């Protein structure tokens, strides 16, 4: 009887450890995916900002070229 209790306890501990490992792996994978997604979103936002800056700079240059001829 005592041996059976040890086996049951050992199996429960093993299952708990396996569950913990699986949960940790899933969490790690999810966190990595979230991080990659966040970095991709930030890169896309930075790219849009650069494009806006580029357009604004082109508009400024265009106005600078037009201003002297208008005077």
Swiss-Prot record:
Subunit description: Binds to two alpha/beta-tubulin heterodimers.
GO cellular component: a single term: neuron projection
Protein name as it appears in the record: Stathmin-1-B
Cross-referenced SUPFAM superfamilies: Stathmin
Coiled-coil annotated spans: 1-67
Keyword Phosphoprotein annotated: yes
PTM text: From unphosphorylated forms to highly phosphorylated ones in the mature egg, followed by progressive dephosphorylation from the mid-blastula to the tailbud stage.
Organism of origin: Xenopus laevis (African clawed frog)
Major site of localization recorded for this protein: cytoplasm
PROSITE patterns (UniProt xref): STATHMIN_3 (PS51663)
The protein's role, per its UniProt record: Involved in the regulation of the microtubule (MT) filament system by destabilizing microtubules. It prevents assembly and promotes disassembly of microtubules.
């Amino acid at each position: 009887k005592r041996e059976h209790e040890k086996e049951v306890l050992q199996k429960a501990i093993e299952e708990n450890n396996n569950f913990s490992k699986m949960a940790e792996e899933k969490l790690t994978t999810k966190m990595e995916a979230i991080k990659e997604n966040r970095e991709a979103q930030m890169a896309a936002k930075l790219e849009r900002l650069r494009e806006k800056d580029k357009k604004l700079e082109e508009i400024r240059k265009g106005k600078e070229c037009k201003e002297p001829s208008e005077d």
